[in-house]
Structures are given as structure tokens and as C-alpha cells.
Amino acid sequence: MLKEVRPAVVSLLALTMITGLAYPLAVTGLATVLFPYQAQGSLVERGGKVVGSALIGQEFKGDEYFHGRPSATVAPDPADSSKTVSAPYNAANSGGSNLGPTSKALADRLSEDVAKLKAENPAAPIPVDLVTTSGSGLDPDISPEGALFQVPRVAKARGVTEEQIRKLVGASIEQPLGGVLGESRVNVLKLNLALDAAAPR
């Protein structure tokens, strides 16, 4: 009996060591050597202090900042653990709203967002990414059009010219990888940090 069981036990232990220990350590070690910034979570620092990650969006409020996409993430309701409450950019509970096109809640939210954006910049068409959530609810980027749409509000709140803010947006645009993969985008956290440095409140 021991003779028959021994190969299975040895195989189990060997594969556990290879796939559960050696392989993850090797991949982590290589990533840390070859891509140290990404391996540590693409953390963004300011004045030696971590203020966020380039890969995870965060909520910015106030007219003086650029805003990201709407986030549909939720968190447990402190008053009733069987329910949830809205918690934008909750990285512990990534996901979309799963609301369909016939959902009244989705239609109401879209109408409210569109009305707010039209009041902010009546003459410009509203970029779709400013009213739609991403699949993860944690998207750190917006389109260049989404950033440019917000320029008048930000410039007015900061007391600077729109041209100054447009130049900042232009300098913050990240191109598709290799010119073909993905779309042009603006990282909201990095743009707001550049904004604070160039035009302090």
C-alpha cells in the first residue's frame, strides 16, 4: 500500500513546493528587479508620502480638481450589514453596478450626472466617460476629452487662465502603448498633483 501511495505524496509535495512557493517567489523576484515601480503597486508619492496608486482611481471633490469617472463600488452599510451603501472607488469591493439599460436607478443617475455637467459647461458635448462607470469602478484614467471638458471649471476655481490648464492637460496625456494598444488617456491623480504644483489653490 505504501508503495502505491508514495509516488502520489511525493508528487503532491513537489508540485506544492514548485507551484506554491518556488514559482511565485521567482516571478515576484523578477518583477521586483525588472519592474520595481509596478511591482510595488505603481505608488505615487508627493513630498515623500504615498498619496495613491497610478492604477487605482480615487474620488476628487471640489471645483478646483479634475474628477474621474463615476464609480459604482459599494461598502457594507454600517447601520445594517445586510445592505450596502455607495462608496466610490472602494478598492476592497471592486465591481460595476450591474444595472441594465432598462434600470430606473441607472437612468436617474445618468440624468442627474448629465444635468450637473451641462450646468458646468453648457456649450460643450459631454464625453461619455464622465457619465459611465468602468467595469471595476476603480478606473484611474479619463479621456483627454473628459479632462478638457473640465478645464473651464478648474481654471475658474484656481483663478488661472483656461489656456494654462489646457497646457497642463496636454502634457498629462498618455499615448497608447506602442502607439496601438489602448487609447489616449489622462491619469486623474497625476494630473491633479501636477495641477497643485503648477497652480496652487
From Swiss-Prot:
Name the family: Belongs to the KdpC family.
Where is this protein localized, as stated in its record?
Cell inner membrane
Q: Which InterPro entries match?
A: KdpC
Highest taxon of source: Bacteria
Which species is the source of this protein?
Answer: Rhodopseudomonas palustris (strain TIE-1)
Q: What is this protein called?
A: Potassium-transporting ATPase KdpC subunit
Annotated signal sequence is: none
- Cite the entry's keywords alphabetically: ATP-binding, Cell inner membrane, Cell membrane, Ion transport, Membrane, Nucleotide-binding, Potassium, Potassium transport, Transmembrane, Transmembrane helix, Transport
Q: Tell me which GO cellular component terms the UniProt record holds.
A: plasma membrane
Q: Transmembrane ranges?
A: 12-34
Q: How does it assemble?
A: The system is composed of three essential subunits: KdpA, KdpB and KdpC.
Instruction: Please name the Pfam families in this protein's record.
Output: KdpC
Q: Where is this chain primarily localised?
A: membrane
Identify a single GO molecular function assigned to this protein: P-type potassium transmembrane transporter activity
Describe the function of this protein: Part of the high-affinity ATP-driven potassium transport (or Kdp) system, which catalyzes the hydrolysis of ATP coupled with the electrogenic transport of potassium into the cytoplasm. This subunit acts as a catalytic chaperone that increases the ATP-binding affinity of the ATP-hydrolyzing subunit KdpB by the formation of a transient KdpB/KdpC/ATP ternary complex.
Annotated region (Disordered), positions in chain:
69-102
UniProt lists compositionally biased (Polar residues) regions at 81-101
